[in-house]
Amino acid sequence: MLSLAHFLVLGAILFAISIVGIFLNRKNVIVLLMALELLLLAVNMNFVAFSHYMGDLAGQVFVFFILTVAAAESAIGLAILVVLFRNLDTINVDDMDTLKG
């Protein structure tokens, strides 16, 4: 049977991978969004693990709120990406300061 430590280590590994992804790929918007989603999923895994082992459902309910905010954040980020690509024909983060409107 898996213990709490197994889930926390997996969450920490996912969190570290996402932080590395954010720092190494700061030019591409798609990679940044994927790394941010992985970061939120790592936090969600820790919430669910603690909630399960403590016998409280509050952490699992909080995960649904985080997933809802993450979905809205992804939709807004992809909308900005589409506008950036239509106007500038690039998805480079450095070119985002030229958007007006």
Curated annotation (Swiss-Prot):
Family statement: Belongs to the complex I subunit 4L family.
Keyword terms, alphabetized: Cell inner membrane, Cell membrane, Membrane, NAD, Quinone, Translocase, Transmembrane, Transmembrane helix, Transport, Ubiquinone
Top-rank EC class of the record's enzyme: translocase
Regions crossing the membrane: 4-24, 30-50, 61-81
One Pfam family recorded for the sequence: Oxidored_q2
Reaction catalyzed: a quinone + NADH + 5 H(+)(in) = a quinol + NAD(+) + 4 H(+)(out)
Subcellular location: Cell inner membrane
Protein name in UniProt: NADH-quinone oxidoreductase subunit K
Claim: rRNA-binding is one of the keywords in the record: no
Biological source species: Cupriavidus metallidurans (strain ATCC 43123 / DSM 2839 / NBRC 102507 / CH34)
